[in-house]
A protein has these predicted regions:
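Bacterial N-terminal signal peptides that target proteins for export
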Residues: 1-7
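Acidic, surface-exposed loops and disordered segments
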Residues: 20-234
């Protein structure tokens, strides 16, 4: 059996980066112990990823924290390279590993590959023009009735945002580029996406995430600012 993901890393990193693996016996023991939590399908998925971030020790790819720090928004994509279906599936699996309020998992994902559809999104959405040049886009949608009472219904925004971050990090880990372009809460943008993608009532698009192989390499920004940290109280 190939290297096995340390389940402790998977569960602790809400930003599940596809393919982070360990070969230590402790990792295997943890994977078996957490089998009831992770499930057979998820365990096989995380242990079998070969294209993305494989392991810290092989020296070819970054560890989790480095991957988080080096992720950047990509707005230009290589038109000649098609994103493999296997990578798209891994990205979506990573998205569905996100946390959600009361484990309601209110998300739905529309994978857009049709060039005409991508062009429509780019034309109708001011922040999503880059979708025209992308190989695909994932539109993250949430259920407006997630089964939670009162203001809890609004938690779909948090849940789908967590899933969206997983998408960005998984894409980065698989050698792809992606960018989060906002839809919600703009009413005109929401209406446009509903129309183009035939999104049913009861669901709202949070964003459009164009994805493809990068055709640019912008500098990584150092966003660390200790002045933003407050100890015990503001």
């Amino acid at each position: 059996m190939s290297k096995i993901v340390t389940v402790g890393v998977v569960l602790a990193a809400a930003l599940t980066l596809v393919g982070c693996e360990k070969v230590e016996n402790a990792g295997r023991k943890a994977a078996r112990k957490a089998g009831s939590l992770v499930g057979r399908g998820s365990t096989e998925f995380f242990s079998g990823v070969g294209e993305g971030i494989r392991t810290v020790s092989d020296g070819n790819v970054p560890d989790v924290l480095t991957a988080i720090a080096t992720r950047k928004s990509i707005r230009k994509f290589d038109p000649l390279r098609t994103v493999e279906d296997e990578k798209v599936e891994k990205i979506l699996k990573a998205a569905m590993c996100a946390p959600s309020a009361m484990d309601k998992r209110p998300w739905e994902f529309v994978v857009v590959k049709d060039k005409a559809q991508l062009q429509k999104l780019g034309e109708r959405l001011p922040y999503s023009r880059v979708a025209n040049g992308a190989q695909l886009a994932i539109v993250v949608c949430g259920s407006l009735d997630n089964g939670l009472p009162g203001r809890g219904k609004e938690y779909w925004i948090h849940d789908c945002s967590a899933a969206s971050m997983n998408i960005l990090l998984a894409a980065h880990g698989l050698g792809l580029g992606a960018v989060w372009t906002g839809v919600f809460p703009g009413e005109e943008r929401i209406a446009a996406v509903r129309e183009i993608l035939a999104i049913p009532d009861g669901y709202a698009p949070l964003n459009v995430i164009p994805i493809g192989y990068p055709a640019e390499d912008p500098a990584v920004k150092d966003k660390w600012n200790p002045a933003k940290i407050h100890a015990d109280r503001w």
